[in-house]
Amino acid sequence: TPSLEKMEELSKFISTFGYIIKGDKEEVHPKALQGIIEKIKGKKEEGAISTIMLRSLKQAKYSPECSGHFGLAAKFYCHFTSPIRRYPDLQIHRIIKESLNNKISGKRQEQLTTIVDYASVQSSEKERKAELAERDVHDFYKALYMKDKVGQEFEGVVSSVTSFGIFVELDNTIEGLIRLANMNDDYYIYDESSYSVLGERTKKSYKIGDLVKIKVESVNVDFKEIDFEIVEKIEE
């Protein structure tokens, strides 16, 4: 279940678009979020709200406790199978086979409890490491791909806004950073509550979901960094 703090942040953000999350924020039901997803489908704010909603959810981890599945709104859930066999799947398969063959004694139950506790922690840690390694490889090849495109212009969507810059994702899923320090047309102030930046003098703003045209400013393959500069905001 998402934390109260994350749900309050999400609630405040979507309220600027005229949406509310029904029910108790401390025990939000998946159907409440599903209702928001259905309402925003096809609308210009869909991308922005979907992004923030996804970030408000806790990262999944393996656990020996039966804590259900928030996304499926399932009270009881077991990680049994997947397109690619994971170790937790195999561990559950072994336990089920033993159970069907009536081979789980009291002593074996204690052994399995220890095994499952360890397997849950180890599998969660290894999965995080695998995800980081995968992301690292993707970032390297994205930078390599963009190396010869410095100076070229593309259209993209603001995918994230931070205190130091604006991230823009292109149609080909490549993401680059527009550093606030390099935006010379104004001094931009970051507003954490609305995930946006606002120009102090011009009042020009950029927020998640905005369409923009960018120019590839620089690419550092070794550091896997792609820097953009803003050309213009595309008004819909």
Question: Residue ranges of each PLM-predicted region?
Answer:
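A conserved acidic, glycine/proline-rich C-terminal tail/linker
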Residues: 195-204
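Append "with occasional cross-activation on large, charged helical scaffolds in nucleic-acid assemblies
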Residues: 1-171, 177-184, 188-195, 210, ...
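OB-fold/S1-family single-stranded nucleic acid-binding modules
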Residues: 204-236
